[in-house]
Amino acid sequence: MGMGVIMRKGYIYTALSAIIFGLMPLLTKIIIARGATSLTIAFFRVFYVTIVLFFVLKLKKIDFHLEKRDLLSVMLTSIFGSGLTIIILNESYNYVDTGIATSLHFLYPLFVAILCCFFYGEKIKKKQIISLSFALVGIICFMSKGNGSLFGYFLAIASGLTYAFYLVKMDKTGLVKMNALKLSFYLALFTTIEIFTINLFMQDVVFKMDAIAYGLLLVLALSASFLATVLLQQGVLLLGSTRASFICLLEPVTSMIVGILFLGEALTLNKGLGGLAIIISLIIFLKE
């Protein structure tokens, strides 16, 4: 298989992942309206996936065994990467508008480039700097006016850093070369344990919900924490963490379109300019 075909597959996988993630705010708002909290959604997203993947691995007869080195890498990636990202991003929604929090979270391509530069000696190319500049302009445009605290801004930005850690750790430790279903299972398992432990102190996970809410949580889990996550893992494997993180910028654009079409959100000048800036960013980045 030629390098061009491999790269195209990587771009498609990552773009599909970003689009699926971008659809999640619509489903999340519906579930919250039925009595769930942000931490409830975070918990059941990974809890459901852990159970489903356990039986999938059993049926496919995939070995559960992990080498000690891989076990440590998966634990660190889950607890301080994907798990911590879900927790602190959801917590930031309690302090700032969700639009601002999500926009600040999308500083993570910058953090990915910085982490790869400082810890792995990768050079930041001129094209990446130009592309990232447009992306930052787009993110700033997406930031709607609203009240918020500095602590909320800090949490949202920190979630971008932890997500960057997740992407880089998967790429540089070779975790993406592991069976995708097996990796997703262990990431979900450790994140479930992490959120459950935190809830022992916070008591914020709601269990008294109707059947529809539980059904929607299952759909959310299978689409976001399973399908989109596996697609992203394959995208990182084929593209590397830096390229993949830029393609993920399709997510806020998707969220904006979904908000306008289904949530009655207005198409403001800032949103339009933000979407255009991110599209330009992607065109520059993808241009050979």
Question: Over which residues does each language-model region extend?
Answer:
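Glycine-/small-residue-enriched transmembrane alpha-helix faces in small-molecule transporters
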Residues: M1-T40, F44, G146-K172, I193
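C-terminal-most transmembrane helix of multi-pass membrane proteins
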Residues: M7, V46, F55-K58, I130, ...
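Hydrophobic alpha-helical transmembrane segments of multi-pass membrane transport proteins
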Residues: L16-L23, L27, V56, S73-Y95, ...
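Small-residue-rich packing faces within the transmembrane alpha-helices of Major Facilitator Superfamily
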Residues: G22-L23, F47-I51, L136, L189-I193, ...
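Hydrophobic/aromatic residues within transmembrane alpha-helices
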Residues: I31, I41, R45, S92, ...
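Transmembrane alpha-helices of multi-pass small-molecule transport proteins
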Residues: A33-L84, F111-V112, T162-K169, S184-Q203, ...
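Specific alpha-helical transmembrane segments that line the substrate/conduction pathway
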Residues: T40-A42, V46-T50, L89-K123, S159, ...
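Hydrophobic transmembrane alpha-helices of multi-pass small-molecule transport proteins
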Residues: L53, L115, I124-M143, G160, ...
